[in-house]
């Protein structure tokens, strides 16, 4: 049973909350009024480790969170992470230039209404050397514009080099029982070696590991849903992966909890902070109460067998997006 984890000098409740789906990627574009109930439920439950980004909207996601925090006067109760590194208001390309970082933090602060606790570079730009981007990010910390800095979806080599230039506090990357690539590419091991916190996004497999999976065919996704472009969700891969998810579902039934709860409890058992997203208050409660699930050593071993044997089919991003991860 894991109820909190260390983040630098803090103890943060886990799991946290990923706000991306409120306004980006999953076919959703919620108004403030539509998003408020799930944010309020998170606050009421004590789920206070929140994640957003400039590109989720663009700008809209940060603004919704900022408006909510002002309305409920709850800044002191929340840990807020955001991200730059994508030219969201321009052409959408990946950029890590010092000027971009310097400019985007100001917009983040304006939309949130305060300085974020943690500021990431969202994707790594191969055209900007770390010797330019990391000092620029570090300067935000030195100026008090963020307390912690991090990288997202970088390689183990990049994380190590960046940390040699300036202290990196966190790395965010995809991790779930459905996606364990960072166990084998060295990223998790490198983060642990360097004492860098690993934040797991997509801990429910971007929808595979939910209780009432509503999609029966790849054509069932909304037109704007990014999963229409992801090989893992298309063609025969869809049906193969759906069968794998059913294997995890059987384990959850034996545990007498929901599939998301056992999936999140398993991520926590790996010592990683997860940030599952949802737009529904009841799902928020379901996710957060995964902290009450205690997996036995035998159950962890059983799930590990499923994870290691039932490998999902297809890439986790489309060809274009794959070029900007693991760099």
Curated annotation (Swiss-Prot):
UniProt binding sites for NADP(+): 51, 152-153, 202-212, 286-294
Top-level EC class as recorded in UniProt: oxidoreductase
Oxidoreductase in keyword set: yes
Entry EC number(s): 1.1.1.-
Effect of inactivating the gene: Does not affect tolerance to 2-benzoxazolinone (BOA).
Pfam families, per database record: Aldo_ket_red
Keyword field contains Iron: no
Keywords: NADP, Oxidoreductase
Family the UniProt entry places it in: Belongs to the aldo/keto reductase family. Aldo/keto reductase 2 subfamily.
PANTHER family per the UniProt record, alphabetical: AFLATOXIN B1 ALDEHYDE REDUCTASE, REDUCTASE (YAKC), PUTATIVE (AFU_ORTHOLOGUE AFUA_8G01560)-RELATED
General remark: Fusarium verticillioides possesses 2 unlinked loci, FDB1 and FDB2, necessary for detoxification of antimicrobial compounds produced by maize, including 2-benzoxazolinone (BOA). The FDB2 cluster arose as a duplication of the FDB1 cluster with rearrangement and expansion by incorporating additional genes.
Function text: Aldo-keto reductase; part of the Fusarium detoxification of benzoxazolinone cluster 2 (FDB2) involved in the degradation of benzoxazolinones produced by the host plant. Maize, wheat, and rye produce the 2 benzoxazinone phytoanticipins 2,4-dihy-droxy-7-methoxy-1,4-benzoxazin-3-one (DIMBOA) and 2,4-dihydroxy-1,4-benzoxazin-3-one (DIBOA) that, due to their inherent instability once released, spontaneously degrade to the more stable corresponding benzoxazolinones, 6-methoxy-2-benzoxazolinone (MBOA) and 2-benzoxazolinone (BOA), respectively.
The name this protein goes by in its record: Aldo-keto reductase FVEG_12638
């Amino acid at each position: 049973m894991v109820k909190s984890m260390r983040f630098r000098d803090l103890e943060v409740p886990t799991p946290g909350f990923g706000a991306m789906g409120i306004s980006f990627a999953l076919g959703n574009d919620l108004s403030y009024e539509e998003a408020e109930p799930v944010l309020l439920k998170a606050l009421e439950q004590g789920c206070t480790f929140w994640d957003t980004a400039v590109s989720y909207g663009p700008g809209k996601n940060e603004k919704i969170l900022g408006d909510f925090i002002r309305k409920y006067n709850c800044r002191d109760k929340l840990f807020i992470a955001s991200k730059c590194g994508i030219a969201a208001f321009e052409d959408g390309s990946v950029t890590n230039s010092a000027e971009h970082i310097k400019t985007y933090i100001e917009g983040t602060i304006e939309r949130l209404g305060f300085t974020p606790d943690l500021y990431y570079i969202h994707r790594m730009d191969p055209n900007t050397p770390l010797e330019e981007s990391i000092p620029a990010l570090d300067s935000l910390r030195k100026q008090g514009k963020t307390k912690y800095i991090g990288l997202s979806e970088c390689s183990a080599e990049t994380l190590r080099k960046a940390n040699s230039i300036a202290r990196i506090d966190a790395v965010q990357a995809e991790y779930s029982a459905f996606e364990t690539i960072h166990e084998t590419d060295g990223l998790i091991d490198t983060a642990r070696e360097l004492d860098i916190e690993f934040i797991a996004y997509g801990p429910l497999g971007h929808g595979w590991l939910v209780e009432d999976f509503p999609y029966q065919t790849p054509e069932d996704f909304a037109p704007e849903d990014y999963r229409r472009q992801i090989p893992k969700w298309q063609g025969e891969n869809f049906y193969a992966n759906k069968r794998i998810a059913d294997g995890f579902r059987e384990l959850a039934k034996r545990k007498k909890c929901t599939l998301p709860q056992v999936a999140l409890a398993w991520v926590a058992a790996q010592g990683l902070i997860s940030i599952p997203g949802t737009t529904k208050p009841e799902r928020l409660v379901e996710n957060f109460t995964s902290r009450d699930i205690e997996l036995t050593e035998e159950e962890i071993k059983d799930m590990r067998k499923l994870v290691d044997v039932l490998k999902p089919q297809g890439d986790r991003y489309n060809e274009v997006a794959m070029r900007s991860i693991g760099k």
